[in-house]
């Protein structure tokens, strides 16, 4: 009788162990191949974990190709990972994270006519550090944009009737920021009255320009025109 009880207990424990393994496999079916990055033996080295199953839509990169870029007088083959908010560069065919320094890292990409700066900026009530694209700049006025890519977790079908949804890197709308007289970098207001109040000496002229030119405070080209008008 005791032997029978022992056999039953061992069988049940084995079943629970196998079940937990299967549950673990199900949870890890859709794992990101890009977002989980490990640092290898070399500091800053990037290694990408491979996916076991499932599809992946989109990309964490604004441009997946490594493009010639200039940083502090040196030239690198680089690309920008907007999901991780990091630049990567090639070093003897190895992908390495570029170390960014606040206020000191400027990445210029002549081929794309783009310049990134690593800055401290205000986002609502919090402050963030990251790369912003410079759209317009004078000594007293600057316009930036933040490029964003979010990771959306996929859905694994539990039965043959369920629909599978792949993991996805989704490019979000760019967010625009301004800086006046070297002050805080903050979001561009999307309402005309709030925006014109930033420029008390020019508020009427700016308001007229926005209305007469049908300027959208959410559109990159419109904002560049507007800031060029203000900066004259």
Q: What are these regions, as identified by a protein language model?
A:
Residues 60-187:
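Aromatic-patch recognition
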Residues 42-71:
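A short, Trp-centered hydrophobic/proline-enriched beta-strand micro-motif
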Residues 19-53:
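Sec-dependent signal peptide cleavage junction
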Residues 187, 196-232:
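Long, compositionally biased interface segments
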Residues 190:
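Acidic/His-leaning functional-site neighborhoods
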Residues 1-25, 226:
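Bacterial Sec-dependent N-terminal signal peptides
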